[in-house]
Amino acid sequence: MTSPSGRLAGKVAMVTGASSGIGKACIERFSAENATVIAVDIAKPVTEGLMGQLSSYACDVTNSDSIKEVINNISSEYGGLHIVVNSAGVSARNALSDTTDIERIWDRVIEVNLKGTFLTSMHSVPEIEKSGGGAIINLASTMGIVGYPTGLRNGYSAYPPSKGGVVQFTKTLAVDLADRGIRVNCLCPGFVETSLTESLTSDNETNNYLKGLHPMGRLGRPDEIANAALFLASDESSFITGSSLVIDGGYTAQ
């Protein structure tokens, strides 16, 4: 990991989907840069043993009341909010226990990945604006910007449009908030070693196939995505808004 330098000192950051994968990597990276970090997930994330000033809340990002309660608590306890990372997400493989109900899987993936990003952003904006502005970073995917064969009847077809929606929502929100001191960008990772891809990479043949999609010959790591999130959260990206930063080992360059 890059040596910390206090790039987020004095900032309050909320990260959803913080229990594992990219979200967890973000809370670790932001905390190392001296941010006050609020870790949020459907079940209260465990932050014991992590360095820095961290707190955690259970929150359902598909429920407005749940989100508003967390943001009100953040405002009361920390006096503001500057950075939001919308990392909460599901795939068809973990959206529902019943993997045969394709229609419900579609609804659930869209609800968490797209509606959750919308609701969390919507309820965060007033607090970020009151705090003097800041940044929203949304987690999209390369699947949101290129076509990828998923199979119409297996439920996986919901994931790309959910992430494509995040890309377009990011652009729309960025334009809406540009004159209010809030920058909005999204990250589009390729395949990354997280719980969302664990069931795929456990099979050697599939794992090698996925690695082969990337010219660099490997999958991404959560900390590599967190480093990009840090850049977009920091003042180093002060003239960047409405952008989709692709982090994919060359996958979309082919």
What are these regions (language model features)?
Residues 178, 183, 240-242:
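Short, small/polar-rich loop/turn modules that mediate ligand/substrate recognition or access, typified
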Residues 121-122, 171:
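A short, exposed helix-loop element centered on a Lys and neighboring polar residues
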